[in-house]
């Protein structure tokens, strides 16, 4: 069996935490989902308004995809996961088109696995609740101040 993690490298190494903890399933191989695209940077370029269409999200030619997944054995059971299942499902389809015959999507994804604290994981990092509370408090103070200023401005009219 081989485990394929298609999340970003930052999610894989635990820097981008999207569950109680960050990290990855032991032994997983990280090949980010976006690497399937002709231009893996398309999503970021769209967000930065550097481009106006998603043509770069088209799949690479089959030969390029075969090279991308050459570390994997197409005859082994392949478990694919991501954060929630969407990226894994699409990657599973790509693998099947490439001739992988035993592809499964781990439905619980990292969201379920990462929140199961007794499940083994590598590169474990934890969500910093204290920092979040501090930032939320500061944000609430700013909202309160802005509401006060708005009320005062309306009173002057």
Which residues make up each language-model segment?
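Rhodanese-like catalytic fold shared by cysteine-dependent sulfurtransferases
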Residues: 1-2, 6-157
